[in-house]
């Protein structure tokens, strides 16, 4: 059954429970906010992870391939267990981007801490990739697919692999 809430950024949003991403431990700095939906323009690689418990809380995200086509985060096995799957075909990654309001062309992406999604259960967790070479503030070129903006589920084409702790 559809439900609605009001987002400060997007106004009234209608969603179903199948749209909700459940973060069992929240996100860093937002540990108490555990239910989120993806919203945004179909034709824009930047989507918004909108919290349904706090209409003021929305984070811009994108798929790693929009930022770095050869991105291959190594994810600790215990994080894979937390989302309930070790099968790469069940998993997808999102990257949180930072878009400075006064200078959106200075967008950066946090490649070090991707969001790991189980596409079947909609459980998600932000993880620290074991790839130390991935920066927290990777400068993003806005000349390609990315442009700062405003539902589809991310494709599972972005690669992630497990690594023992």
Predicted regions and their residues:
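Short active-site loop/helix that positions an aromatic residue
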Residues: 77-87
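Long, compositionally biased stretches
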Residues: 2-68, 88-165
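Extended catalytic/binding region for NAD+/ADP-ribose chemistry, centered on the ART fold
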Residues: 70-75
């Amino acid at each position: 059954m559809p439900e609605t809430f009001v987002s400060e950024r997007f106004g009234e949003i209608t969603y179903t429970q199948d749209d909700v991403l459940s973060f069992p431990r929240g996100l860093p700095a937002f540990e108490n906010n555990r239910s989120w939906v993806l919203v945004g323009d179909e034709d824009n690689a930047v989507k918004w992870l909108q919290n349904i418990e706090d209409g003021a809380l929305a984070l811009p995200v994108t798929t790693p391939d929009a930022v770095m086509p050869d991105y291959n985060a190594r994810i600790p096995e215990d994080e894979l267990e937390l989302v309930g799957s070790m099968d790469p075909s069940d998993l997808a990654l999102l990257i949180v981007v930072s878009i400075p309001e006064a200078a959106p062309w200075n967008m950066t992406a946090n490649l070090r801490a991707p969001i790991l999604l189980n596409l079947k259960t909609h459980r998600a967790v932000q993880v620290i990739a074991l790839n130390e070479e991935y920066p927290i503030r990777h400068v993003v070129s806005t000349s390609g697919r990315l442009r700062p903006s405003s539902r589809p589920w991310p494709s599972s084409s972005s690669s992630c692999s497990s690594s023992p702790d």
